[in-house]
């Protein structure tokens, strides 16, 4: 099934930002879809996450090609597909990034393990999207399944994944 990309008005949920250390070798941004928050906190968190996401995209690809594709595809490279899940007990991984120099050291796995443990303890599904096909198998190793793939006339695909509560 392919997720739809209709832009519906979305609720505001509690967002959390985690890092492996003060050096920010990795960051994980999650949204607890079961917990609503106030708008001021939401905009502060969103702004912080956007700035750091953009910084990671630029750092990972100095040619700015990936960053340019994200700007260009912003109207459909988003999480609106999660509306189809009809699941309020859900964590959504908004962003997971590891500094390229620190990759392959288990940092992402540690952050994911902690997220999965939290979700299991709270009987929650986890959803996420990735734009890197190589990441799909990585997430499958943690029990995620491809829910759908968003494609347009555009060189970037969005792989939508879920991990059911088990």
At which residue positions do the language-model features occur?
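Conserved beta-hairpin
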Residues: 14-31
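Conserved GNAT acetyl-CoA-binding A-motif
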Residues: 90-91, 118-131
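Conserved active-site alpha-helix within GNAT-family acetyltransferase domains
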Residues: 109, 121-122, 132-149, 153-155
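Conserved beta-strand-loop-alpha-helix junction that forms the acyl-donor binding cleft
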Residues: 94-103, 127-136, 153-156, 164-165
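Conserved acetyl-CoA-binding loop-helix of GNAT-fold acetyltransferases
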Residues: 95-98, 104-117
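Conserved acyl-donor/pantetheine-binding loop and adjacent beta-alpha core of acyl/acetyltransferases
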Residues: 27-97
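Single conserved hydrophobic/aromatic residue that forms the stacking wall/gate
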Residues: 1-16
